[in-house]
Amino acid sequence: PFLKFATKLMIANYNVPENLAGIIPGLIPFGTILLTPLFGSLYDRIGKGATLMLIGSAMLAAVHFIFAIHIMPVWWFAVIVMITLGVAFSLVPSAMWPSVAKIIPLKTLGSAYSIIFYIQNIGLSLVPVLIGKVNGFDPSYTTSMSIFCAFGVAAIILSILLIIIDKKKHYGLQEANIKK
């Protein structure tokens, strides 16, 4: 949902010319194409899946907080922040999706992934509506970026809970998938 509004954010808050404003948010998908397989391989080799999710979630919250408070309204800073967001967008799924298979029994894994995608698609359909309405009464993007920051904080809390639960139940979220 963030990418839907990111181009206008670049124009409004970072003084990016309209004809170039789409390039900066476009760094995110390009970066995730390169980084997600790299982080997935890292998780396979060193483990620390819940920690990687925690780091990515913290980066996500920090980036949206920075966007909410409008510090350094220059294009090059927006590029740095957007690249950081791309790293976060790569870290979380590269650790999250393989972790599902460690927690959910194989006989219900398909159902678990179905439910995850169901919930994700609810968010992908409703959050843009919410953000669009919020941007209507607050065109500065402070409120909308604060909402995304709150999602990041929720993800931080869930990541910490995963670390705690993994220590108790020994799912192996922090263990490498490739054993030496």
List where the protein language model places each region.
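Extracytoplasmic gate region of multi-pass secondary transporters
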Residues: P1-I33, P93, W97, V127-P128
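Interfacial helix-cap and linker-helix signal at transmembrane-aqueous boundaries
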Residues: M10-I11, L42-D44, I131-P139
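Helix-to-loop junctions at the C-terminal end of transmembrane segments
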Residues: L35-K48
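C-terminal transmembrane helical hairpin of 12-TM major facilitator-type secondary transporters
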Residues: G49-M96
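A late C-terminal transmembrane helix in Major Facilitator Superfamily
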Residues: I103-D138
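A membrane-interface helix-boundary motif in multi-pass transporters
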Residues: K133-G152
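Intrinsic disorder in cytosolic terminal tails and internal cytosolic loops
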Residues: I164-K180
